């Protein structure tokens, strides 16, 4: 098991012999206070949805950062993101612009991630919901 990098008390885990992940980590390890961010969708503080999959993902990520800021945390503290998308084809068709939007909001912070398709979300106009788990160092 190789431990890659160390940002703000978090270490990315990489099993020996596995290909390097691109845009995510296979695992993360950290010690400190854990912050759980409930599912964030692509609307702003006034309840207005961003346009399209890429816009909603960028807004959901900004919403995650707003919650983390309330705990004194930032994107470098995120250990895990779980993405729920209503249209996997739209997600796959937009991987490059999604990657750009992700880096614009989160920088080069790539935690453990999972993406799954769901039939629908509670808010009918929502195309994505993202949960986050962060660790603030001791």
What are these regions (language model features)?
Residues 1-79, 85-138:
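N-terminal presequence-like segments and the immediate start of the first folded domain
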């Amino acid at each position: 098991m190789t431990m890659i990098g160390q940002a703000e008390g978090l270490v990315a885990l990489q099993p020996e012999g596995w290909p390097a992940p691109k845009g995510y980590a296979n695992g993360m390890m950290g010690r400190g206070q854990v912050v759980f961010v409930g599912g964030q969708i692509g609307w702003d503080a006034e309840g207005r949805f961003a346009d399209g999959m890429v816009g909603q993902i960028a807004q959901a990520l900004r919403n995650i950062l707003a919650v983390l800021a309330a705990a004194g945390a930032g994107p470098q503290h995120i250990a895990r993101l779980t993405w729920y998308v209503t249209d996997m084809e739209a997600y796959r068709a937009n991987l490059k612009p999604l990657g750009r939007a992700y880096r614009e909001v989160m920088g080069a912070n790539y935690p453990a991630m999972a993406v799954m398709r769901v039939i629908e979300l509670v808010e009918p106009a929502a195309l994505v919901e993202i949960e986050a788990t962060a660790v603030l160092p001791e």
